[in-house]
């Protein structure tokens, strides 16, 4: 069942494109990109979410990430 978002597809796609452009402009390899994005997620959670909710938000984020990963071996 698809999730309903309060953000438009255009908002999401534009931000995704801009973040991708930054990583590409720095020629960041996959491992560095994942490390930086992971640190960004951690910083967002620690600075913007109440301490009592952080574990639940992190768990929900991790579950959403795992469910969005495609097991297809083709890129």
Swiss-Prot record:
Q: Which InterPro entries match?
A: UPF0352 (IPR009857), YejL_sf (IPR023202)
One Pfam family in the UniProt entry = DUF1414
Q: Which family does it belong to?
A: Belongs to the UPF0352 family.
The cross-references to NCBIfam families, in alphabetical order and at most eight, read:
PRK13689.1
What HAMAP family has UniProt attached to this entry? Answer: UPF0352
Which protein is depicted?
Answer: UPF0352 protein KPN78578_25810
